[in-house]
């Protein structure tokens, strides 16, 4: 089920994200298992120049790693000494995406991004998925949902149903 989603807007000159695991945060939100994944969908081209996603291939097999807070920031990531050792053993893969491309990755995969050195913003959609057996065991202030079963739709969607939907087109 959809656990969390957001639009990621990376303005020109924006700093990248330190290597981290999503499950490090989701574990603290009451998810016992790392049976979670994220999908990033490119609304703009994601290139090395504008700070595309980069992953350390195979690091999802390391399990949940401790993270440390960055000085003068709300960001956190894997301890620098441990990260240096990990980077000797696992290759960095930069994930360049064309508009409409998507990449799916495990919640324990170490990932981050570089700075946006381009003159243009970069927009992606991020959807994070959980399994129903891993519904958080306790509430959290994050607003991420518990699993709830969905009832199948019994009526066919007709043209007038679509007319009532809001316009979600992006303009910038």
Give residue spans per PLM region.
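Conserved double-stranded beta-helix
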Residues: 1-55
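Feature marks short, surface-exposed loop/turn motifs that line or immediately flank catalytic pockets
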Residues: 11, 47, 62, 131-133
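Conserved hydrophobic/aromatic beta-strand scaffold that supports enzyme active sites
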Residues: 18, 38-42, 92-94, 102-104, ...
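Short, surface-exposed loop/helix-turn segments at secondary-structure junctions
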Residues: 21-24, 77-89, 121, 140-146
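Glycine-rich, charged/polar anion/phosphate-binding loops
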Residues: 23-26, 40-41, 89-91, 109-112
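Active-site neighborhoods and metal-handling regions in enzymes and metal-associated proteins
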Residues: 42-45, 62, 150-151
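Double-stranded beta-helix
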Residues: 46-110
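Non-heme Fe(II)/2-oxoglutarate
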Residues: 102-104, 108-172
């Amino acid at each position: 089920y959809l656990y969390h989603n957001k639009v990621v807007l990376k303005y020109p000159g924006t700093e990248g994200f330190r290597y981290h695991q999503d499950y490090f945060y989701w574990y603290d939100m009451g998810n016992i298992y790392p049976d979670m994944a994220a999908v990033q969908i490119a609304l703009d081209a994601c290139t090395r120049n504008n700070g595309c996603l980069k992953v350390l291939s195979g690091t999802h097999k390391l399990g949940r790693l401790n993270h440390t807070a960055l000085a003068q920031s709300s960001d956190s990531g894997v301890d620098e000494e441990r990260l240096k050792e990990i980077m000797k053993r696992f290759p960095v893969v930069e994930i360049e995406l064309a508009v409409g491309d998507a990449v799916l990755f495990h919640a324990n995969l170490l990932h981050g991004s570089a700075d946006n050195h381009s003159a243009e913003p970069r927009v992606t959609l991020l959807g994070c998925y959980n399994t129903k057996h891993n519904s958080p065991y306790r509430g959290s202030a994050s607003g991420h949902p518990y699993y709830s079963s969905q009832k199948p739709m019994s009526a066919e969607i007709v043209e007038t149903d679509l007319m009532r939907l809001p316009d979600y087109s992006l303009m910038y």
